[in-house]
């Protein structure tokens, strides 16, 4: 089955050759999302909670552009720069998934933008049951 590229209105230019999301057979794959503005500048420097909110709002835009909602997210891949930010990231994250939580993992690593503190990639099931 062919894939559909998902690019929400107002999306900035990606840092590399990728798109914000692809939808194939009812499954949406959201690219790793950094806390960037439309010009690819890091926003909310030094504030992991605010960066997490920005990232999740961006992901929400991709999911909604594909016809879904945050409740459709089944898996999140979370990359954080420093474990010291784990609590702040989780506090904001929990507000986006108040009911049943998606599966996820979280690892500490370097990120492509030095001022970025968090990056999240998501998988959502949108459409008919698989």
Swiss-Prot record:
List GO terms (cellular component aspect): cytosol
**Reactions catalysed:** (Z)-3-aminoacrylate + H2O + H(+) = 3-oxopropanoate + NH4(+)
Provide the GO MF annotations for this entry: deaminase activity
Q: Which GO terms describe its biological process?
A: nitrogen utilization; uracil catabolic process
What keywords would UniProt list here?
Hydrolase
Q: Which CDD domains match?
A: YjgF_YER057c_UK114_family
The family database entries (InterPro entries) matched by this protein are listed as:
RutC (IPR019898), RutC-like_sf (IPR035959), YjgF/YER057c/UK114 (IPR006175)
Which enzyme type, at the first EC level? hydrolase
What SUPFAM superfamilies would the database entry show?
A: YjgF-like
Task: Tell me its EC number(s), please.
Answer: 3.5.-.-
What family is this?
Belongs to the RutC family.
Provide the function of this protein.
Involved in pyrimidine catabolism. Catalyzes the deamination of 3-aminoacrylate to malonic semialdehyde, a reaction that can also occur spontaneously. RutC may facilitate the reaction and modulate the metabolic fitness, rather than catalyzing essential functions.
What's the protein name? 3-aminoacrylate deaminase RutC
- The organism is Methylorubrum extorquens (strain ATCC 14718 / DSM 1338 / JCM 2805 / NCIMB 9133 / AM1) (Methylobacterium extorquens)
């Amino acid at each position: 089955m062919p894939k559909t590229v998902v690019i929400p209105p107002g999306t900035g230019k990606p840092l590399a050759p990728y798109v914000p999301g692809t939808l194939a057979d009812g499954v949406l794959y959201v690219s790793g999302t950094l806390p960037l503005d439309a010009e690819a500048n890091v926003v909310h420097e030094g504030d992991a909670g605010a960066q997490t909110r920005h990232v999740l709002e961006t992901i929400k835009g991709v999911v909604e552009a594909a016809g879904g909602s945050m409740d459709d997210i089944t898996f999140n891949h979370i990359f954080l720069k420093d474990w010291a930010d784990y609590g702040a990231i989780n506090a904001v994250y929990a507000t986006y998934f108040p009911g049943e939580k998606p599966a996820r993992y979280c690892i500490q690593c370097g990120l492509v933008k030095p001022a970025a503190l968090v990056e999240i990639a998501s998988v959502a099931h949108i459409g008919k049951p698989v």
